[in-house]
């Protein structure tokens, strides 16, 4: 399976690391090119030395247009001119979010495109589906361009799918307690859209927006107009937490809800949803490959209300779902 990565920032590098990790035991994925406008000597350094996920287990260097990782050589570029032979291009730059702009990759020769973000703009949702692996990926019908939704949507969708089926969700509110990202500022500096995100990321708790709850209906259509939410950015480098409050049509108790989640973690959602019984904290989940990790002691119920809290590595978990989805699309 031949993969091309466009954009070699946090997600692009995590995607490559995830592929390298999988290929150590089951070599099926071949990255045949990476594109990013940045200096490739610096990008090679950043791939090997990661402040969050640690040192790569192979030496990395750049030479003569190639990223050399141990004995592996990957052609790298500062612009894309040809994608012939590419099975799936994973778009990680954050710059091309409208489906029509992603069609350019098909014109250059790629067979399929996977976007590492929600789609923007007006588009046909059947032609350009939003899929969350483990929740609705089985609805894929060989479309050429797919959105992998957001890291937060990947975290809440498995929970909502389970609870809506069992209890019927009437409405819900989401708070994502989210580690800061490159969209914020290291020191106080003007943000183009958001006053609060203009403030120093590592020194403040910063309320801002998220479209994860509003966009959930693109994955679970039954929840359209039933969900809303916001984000609170916190001074941590990685790992986030969902605080999901739901009103259910049926009365629910803590133990039956947790039992449903635990059963799913061992069956249909194994590798996507995990259960934490050790009362761990955020740093314990760095480099956890699951989409969400539920702490059963942080499930609370009151009549028809339920609050569920879950951890997710917003970089590594999401990047692993991108690889899962790319493989699924390719082998469809």
Swiss-Prot record:
One of its GO terms (biological process) is glycolytic process. Its EC number is 1.2.1.12. Pathway: Carbohydrate degradation; glycolysis; pyruvate from D-glyceraldehyde 3-phosphate: step 1/5. D-glyceraldehyde 3-phosphate binds at residues 150-152, 181, 197, 210-211, 233. The keyword Cytoplasm applies. GO terms for cellular component: cytoplasm. The active site is at residue 151. InterPro entries: GlycerAld/Erythrose_P_DH, GlycerAld_3-P_DH_AS, GlycerAld_3-P_DH_cat, GlycerAld_3-P_DH_NAD(P)-bd, Glyceraldehyde-3-P_DH_1, NAD(P)-bd_dom_sf. It catalyses: D-glyceraldehyde 3-phosphate + phosphate + NAD(+) = (2R)-3-phospho-glyceroyl phosphate + NADH + H(+). Coiled coil: none annotated. It is found in: Cytoplasm. Catalyzes the oxidative phosphorylation of glyceraldehyde 3-phosphate (G3P) to 1,3-bisphosphoglycerate (BPG) using the cofactor NAD. The first reaction step involves the formation of a hemiacetal intermediate between G3P and a cysteine residue, and this hemiacetal intermediate is then oxidized to a thioester, with concomitant reduction of NAD to NADH. The reduced NADH is then exchanged with the second NAD, and the thioester is attacked by a nucleophilic inorganic phosphate to produce BPG. Homotetramer. PANTHER family: GLYCERALDEHYDE-3-PHOSPHATE DEHYDROGENASE 2 (PTHR43148). This is Glyceraldehyde-3-phosphate dehydrogenase. It comes from Helicobacter pylori (strain J99 / ATCC 700824).
